[in-house]
Amino acid sequence: MILPINTYSDEVLHQKAKPLKGVDADISSLIDSMFESMENASGIGLAAPQVGCSIRLLVLDVSCMKSYEDVPPMVVINPNVLAVRGKNLMEEGCLSVPGVQGDVLRPSEITLKYRDRNFQEHTEEFSGMLARVLQHEIDHLNGTLFVDRMEKRDRRRIQQELDDIAAGLVPADYPIARECSRGGEGPACM
């Protein structure tokens, strides 16, 4: 099922998400819907708060990108960044901030502890685009958007676009949730 994407001003995007205690049929169904919604929106990563569910779950699929064709889609539950290395400034965008891009400085490598779709624990090192996408999506789980990490002067330049998104004036090629306050209580989050 394709789920609507929450945008910039929706409250659920500014809250710290709650950890999952396991994966049941409802969470498994949510994971499938998140992959379907991400693909429908031509995204490479999607965090549960973006679909109105305040839980520590994200999905990503970077296989559409050159050099990442062999990377399988990932389900990441309860992620914890254990270490970071290096720095890299790169332009980012986000399904929750349609039509806006901006430069964000992030660590270029991370060590991540997380659980997969089967709730099995992993500790792995990630670099390059995969590290960036993971950090971007983990930010969503902590109530942070990429625009919150932009330089102040760059953020001021896009403020009108952010105001337009908040006012519902910016269209997207995928379903957008308006005035969504499910915050983890909607049917997709059960």
From Swiss-Prot:
Family: Belongs to the polypeptide deformylase family.
Reactions performed catalytically: N-terminal N-formyl-L-methionyl-[peptide] + H2O = N-terminal L-methionyl-[peptide] + formate
SUPFAM superfamilies, A to Z: Peptide deformylase
CDD domains per the UniProt record, alphabetical: Pep_deformylase
Protein name per UniProt: Peptide deformylase
Location of the active site: 137
Record's keyword terms, sorted: Hydrolase, Iron, Metal-binding, Protein biosynthesis
Enzyme class, spelled out: hydrolase
Highest rank taxon of the organism: Bacteria
Cofactor binding mode and count: Binds 1 Fe(2+) ion.
EC number(s) stated in the UniProt entry for this protein: 3.5.1.88
A GO term for molecular function: metal ion binding
Cofactors that this protein relies on: Fe(2+)
GO terms under biological process: co-translational protein modification; translation
One Pfam family from the record: Pep_deformylase
Organism: Chlorobium luteolum (strain DSM 273 / BCRC 81028 / 2530)
Positions annotated to bind Fe cation: 94, 136, 140
Function (record text): Removes the formyl group from the N-terminal Met of newly synthesized proteins. Requires at least a dipeptide for an efficient rate of reaction. N-terminal L-methionine is a prerequisite for activity but the enzyme has broad specificity at other positions.
